[in-house]
Each structure stands twice: as C-alpha cells, then as structure tokens.
Swiss-Prot record:
<keyword id="KW-0963">Cytoplasm</keyword>
<dbReference type="InterPro" id="IPR018085">
    <property type="entry name" value="Ura-DNA_Glyclase_AS"/>
</dbReference>
<dbReference type="InterPro" id="IPR002043">
    <property type="entry name" value="UDG_fam1"/>
</dbReference>
<keyword id="KW-0378">Hydrolase</keyword>
<dbReference type="InterPro" id="IPR036895">
    <property type="entry name" value="Uracil-DNA_glycosylase-like_sf"/>
</dbReference>
<keyword id="KW-0227">DNA damage</keyword>
<comment type="similarity">
    <text>Belongs to the uracil-DNA glycosylase (UDG) superfamily. UNG family.</text>
</comment>
<protein>
    <recommendedName>
        <fullName>Uracil-DNA glycosylase</fullName>
        <ecNumber>3.2.2.27</ecNumber>
    </recommendedName>
</protein>
<dbReference type="GO" id="GO:0005737">
    <property type="term" value="C:cytoplasm"/>
</dbReference>
<keyword id="KW-0234">DNA repair</keyword>
<dbReference type="InterPro" id="IPR005122">
    <property type="entry name" value="Uracil-DNA_glycosylase-like"/>
</dbReference>
<dbReference type="GO" id="GO:0004844">
    <property type="term" value="F:uracil DNA N-glycosylase activity"/>
</dbReference>
<comment type="function">
    <text>Excises uracil residues from the DNA which can arise as a result of misincorporation of dUMP residues by DNA polymerase or due to deamination of cytosine.</text>
</comment>
<dbReference type="GO" id="GO:0097510">
    <property type="term" value="P:base-excision repair, AP site formation via deaminated base removal"/>
</dbReference>
<feature type="active site" description="Proton acceptor">
    <location>
        <position position="62"/>
    </location>
</feature>
<dbReference type="Pfam" id="PF03167">
    <property type="entry name" value="UDG"/>
</dbReference>
Length: 217
C-alpha cells in the first residue's frame, strides 16, 4: 500500500481495520467505473517520498479528473500531458519567484523530499471531488499528524481554504507553515501570485541547516 514506515505510523492514527476498509473501497470503485489515478498510483506520493526524507508537504484537494492527467502526486501531470490551469499558475509563480521550469511532471520534487499529497487519493472520471468525504480524509489527515510528530522541521505549504483548515493538525513548534490562496484561476490573483512559496521554503530549510529543494530540476 504505502512505504512500510509510513504504513505503520499512519495506522496508529486510524480506527482498527481502516486499511481493510480502504482496500474494499478501492475494489468497488475501480470495478464500477473509470477512476483516476490508475490504481497502482493511488499511494504513489507515499511510495516515492519516504517519511524520513520528507521535509516539505504540498497539499492538494483531489486528483485531476481528466484522462491521463492524474499520476498520484498532487498538482503533477505526466510530461506529455498539457498542464492544467492550477499547474500553469504554480509554474508561473515559480518562474517569477526563482526561475522558469518547462516540465509538468513534479516527480523530481517528490524525490527531493517534497510530499505531493492530495487530501482525497482517488476521483471518478469527470467528477471533481467525487470521492470527497467517503474514505480518504481520515487517512490523509493521519499523514499530516505523522508529519507533525517528526523531530526534524517540515514546511507545510497550504494553498486555499481547504488545505489551510489542516493547520489544526500542525501543532509542533518545530514546523513551519506557508499559506496563501489556491493557484486555481478563480483565486490565484487574490494572493497566490507574489506569495513566493518556493524561495520562502528554501530560506526556511537553509536556516534550519537543511538542503533546499531544487525546484527547477
């Protein structure tokens, strides 16, 4: 399911047998219709960014619901897929903040300790938030609670009202929160543009004696 250390830590914050409930939900969802991302990528964020290496969290809401977009990492799409509007705005802010990045696949961020997590890990094709409130929120809230327990600092990047509600789980004074409106076209001009989350994150990490993220990689 997830990287083994993640698995054990997350489990401690969930009701008994919750993993079984998740597997049952996935069996039914994928058997009954088209669901994104592909099932083998549902837990990709936790598989490619081990707990012990996680130093940044970028929290999304749910996967992209169009064909071939979702790959299990928040805001990221495969290289050959056109960037959706929110990702276009993220890359625009990155260009203004640090420099231009031409590719849409954010896997290289994940491999540097940036956990690209969605609050819901699946979505029915064409139905934004179609799986919201059914199974995922206790699981992904548990991920945030696990990160809150880390001794080493984590930078939590929270974009939009939904993500910012998760501040309630971030109580460890060692950690840092960067928040702004969401990068979607509806809210990007209300404070996302100009918020400089990437340079601010690196400044925090370097002040803590940690290596910054190569956001342009």
């Amino acid at each position: 399911m997830a990287h083994s250390i993640w698995h054990e830590k997350i489990k401690s914050f969930l009701p008994e047998h919750y993993y079984g409930r998740i597997n049952h939900f996935l069996d039914e969802a994928y058997a009954s219709g088209l669901v994104y991302p592909p099932r083998e990528n549902v837990f990709k964020a936790l598989q490619v960014t081990p707990l012990e290496e996680t130093k940044v969290l970028i929290l999304g809401q749910d996967p992209y619901h169009g064909p071939k977009q979702a790959q299990g990492l928040s805001f990221s799409v495969p290289e050959e897929i056109s960037a959706p509007p929110s990702l276009i705005n993220i890359l625009k802010e990155l260009a203004d903040d640090i420099g231009p990045r031409d590719h849409h696949d954010l896997s290289t961020w994940a491999s540097q300790g940036v956990l690209l997590l969605n609050a819901c890990l699946t979505v029915p094709a064409g139905q934004a938030n179609g799986h919201a409130g059914l199974i995922w929120e206790p699981f992904t809230d548990a991920v945030i609670k696990v990160l809150n327990e880390k001794d080493s600092p984590v930078v939590f990047i929270l974009w939009g009202a939904y993500a910012r509600k998760k501040k309630a789980f971030i109580t460890n004074p060692k950690h840092h929160i960067i928040e702004s409106p969401h990068p979607s076209p509806l809210s990007s001009y209300r404070g996302f543009f100009g918020s400089k989350p990437f340079s601010r994150t690196n400044a925090i990490l370097e002040k803590e004696g940690m290596t910054g993220v190569d956001w342009l990689k």
